Amino acid sequence: MAEWDHDPVEGWTPPTAFQRKAILDDTTSIAIVGASKNPARASNFVATYLLSSSTNFTVYMVNPRETEILGEPVYPSLADLPEVPDIVDVFRRNEDLPGIAEEAVAVGAKTFWAQLGLWNPDAALIATEGGLNAVMDRCTKIEHARFAGGLHLAGFNTGVISSRRRT
């Protein structure tokens, strides 16, 4: 969804494309809250991309029910991570977002990022009032690939976007 598809949130303005690029440029570590070992889940797809050689991010998986995903250790909570992540990238239910925003503030993260389809005004306000950037309804993989030149249009008026250039 585009930013204008949502009701405005008093006290919070969605970051512009330039601001999102700056957030990603300033990021070295990302915690994926709600990471899944199921390859059909968006969190697994995004984690695979973020762990790839095309990014320089340290990626932490957070899920209290798992111990390893994509060969990486999984932590039960943000507080259990070995370092404070720059971005807390959330793949959980919308109603879980305020609590996760509180955790992100408590650990001292820089950015609370809710993935595509997630829009929670309370979480955005908790994050920004706690000194964090707040991004909602945006995908870290798509945004990174977009700014790094990794997204290509399949053709005029097709509506198809791919992360792989066809030859």
Where are the model-predicted features located?
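Conserved beta-strand elements of the Class I
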Residues: 31-33
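A charged, well-structured terminal subsegment
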Residues: 143-167
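Short N-terminal or domain-adjacent regulatory/targeting segments
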Residues: 2-26
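NAD(P)-binding Rossmann-fold cofactor-contacting core
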Residues: 36-41, 48-69
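Short acidic low-complexity segments
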Residues: 73-83
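Mid-chain, well-packed structural core segment of small domains
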Residues: 82-119
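Rossmann-fold NAD(P)-binding glycine/threonine-rich loop
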Residues: 116-142
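A short helix->loop->beta-strand "cap" motif at the edges of active sites that frequently abuts
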Residues: 53-57, 107-112, 130-132
